[in-house]
């Protein structure tokens, strides 16, 4: 079921998903959803597999995204051969387009021999053997710490799961139990990647195939702020005394397992840490619990209250600054500056025995800037975590706030 937020309504018209956002002036603006490169790759793969295994042409295909929304894709650039089929889906970013909007995402599905298709990790014991790789214009991972290991195509795990699920569905329909090789390619990918963070992240040769929900939600900054404001006001009206806030769903499983707290119950502030503090105070809250991944909250240690990468990215520099204060050896400092992700940097600190001290230093800086923004009008507590290392630091009253919320 599609979750509804209080400030939004969703509509479907001729296979296109729309929603209306209430603006700050109370007016409604119709906005159109887009679909991720991962959804496009899954749709193209499903169509190519269908044409290969049934021999019938397919000009439209439907897949279900992880969000629960159906993607009705038009199939383009079909090339059929005896043992393989290639086709494409055009990336449509909706009303929140990015650099990949309009790009053709191709999938080639080829009949493969059993011995050339070892089952990928996480594939399970399916009767059909599927190998997923990247071709022209899909980046290749060269640095550790990313979603995929070094050497793999930059096709993240959720798109891989989507591709596998949709192709397995076709294989079951066609009663096919052999092996398939799936290659995702983006002809414009290498050019487009120059305008992304991929070169800096150590992803070379093209773009990444991304997406966790399968859809691109159209959100202007004002629409996001309006939604945050509505949700905070709603929580206050429901009798909550503590504003539970998180930037997103990173660490969702960790928070459920460790604290029995569902991040879905918190107000998602996205990148707007400072604005959310202001709005929570305006809504009448005197307490806030901010739970967040170090990749976002480390920026707050530098006084950055909008954590979007376009506003500034000094994550490693801030980690190094905190590390210097605790005599972290120079080789480790140098290594941190070369890290792609904060997860990787935390592991370096853990390896040299300085993780706890540095995380406490960061937490003190985060609290300093949060309290400065609140200006004495609200008590703010923080839980800082990483996906791989779990809890990194928490402020003195954070656990008490969490117990009250649960």
Where is each model-derived feature located?
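Hydrophobic, Leu/Ile/Phe/Ala-enriched alpha-helical segments that form helix-helix packing faces
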Residues: 48, 159, 163-174, 231, ...
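Surface-exposed flexible segments
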Residues: 106, 258-261, 395-401
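Extended hydrophobic packing segments that form well-structured cores
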Residues: 129, 160, 363-406
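A structural signal for small-residue-enriched, beta-sheet-centric alpha/beta enzyme cores
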Residues: 15-18, 32, 38, 201-207, ...
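Intrinsic structural disorder/low-complexity segments
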Residues: 5-8, 102-104
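Generic N-terminal targeting/processing segments that precede catalytic cores or assembly contacts
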Residues: 13-195, 199-201
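Flexible, glycine-rich phosphate/dinucleotide-binding loops
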Residues: 191, 252, 391
């Amino acid at each position: 079921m599609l979750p509804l937020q209080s400030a939004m309504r969703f509509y479907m018209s001729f296979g296109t998903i729309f929603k209306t956002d209430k603006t700050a002036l109370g007016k409604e603006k119709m906005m159109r959803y887009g679909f991720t490169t991962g959804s496009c790759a899954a749709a193209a793969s499903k169509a190519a597999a269908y044409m290969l295994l049934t021999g019938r042409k397919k000009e439209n295909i439907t897949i279900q995204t992880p969000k629960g929304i159906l993607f009705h894709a038009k199939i383009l650039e079909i090339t059929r051969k005896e043992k393989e089929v290639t086709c494409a889906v055009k990336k449509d970013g909706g009303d929140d387009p990015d650099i990949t909007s309009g790009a053709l995402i191709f999938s080639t599905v080829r009949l493969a021999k059993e011995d050339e298709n070892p089952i990928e990790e996480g594939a399970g014991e399916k009767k059909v053997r599927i190998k997923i790789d990247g071709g022209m214009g899909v980046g290749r991972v060269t640095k550790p710490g990313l979603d995929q290991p070094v050497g793999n195509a930059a096709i993240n795990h959720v798109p891989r799961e989507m591709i596998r699920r949709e192709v397995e569905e076709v294989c079951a329909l066609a009663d096919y139990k052999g092996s398939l090789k799936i290659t995702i390619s983006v002809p414009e990918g290498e050019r487009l990647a120059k305008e992304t963070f991929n070169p800096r992240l150590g992803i070379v040769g093209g773009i990444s195939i991304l997406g966790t929900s399968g859809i691109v939600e159209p959100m202007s900054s004002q629409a996001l702020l309006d939604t945050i404001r509505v949700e905070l006001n709603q929580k206050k009206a429901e009798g909550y005394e503590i504003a539970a806030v998180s930037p997103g769903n990173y660490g969702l499983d960790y928070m459920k397992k460790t604290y029995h707290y569902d991040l879905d119950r918190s107000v998602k502030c996205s990148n707007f840490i400072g604005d959310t503090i202001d709005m929570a105070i305006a809504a009448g809250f005197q307490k806030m619990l901010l739970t967040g991944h170090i990749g976002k909250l480390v920026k707050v240690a530098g006084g950055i209250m909008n954590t979007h990468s376009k506003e500034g990215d000094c994550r490693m520099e801030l980690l190094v600054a905190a590390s210097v204060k605790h005599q972290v050896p120079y080789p480790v400092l140098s290594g941190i500056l070369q890290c792609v992700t904060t997860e990787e940097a935390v592991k370096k600190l853990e390896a040299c025995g300085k993780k706890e001290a540095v995380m406490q230093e960061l937490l003190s800086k985060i609290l300093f800037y949060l309290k400065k923004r609140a200006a004495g009008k609200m008590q703010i507590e923080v839980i800082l975590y990483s996906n791989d290392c779990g809890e990194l630091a928490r402020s003195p009253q954070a656990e008490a706030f969490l117990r009250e919320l649960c």
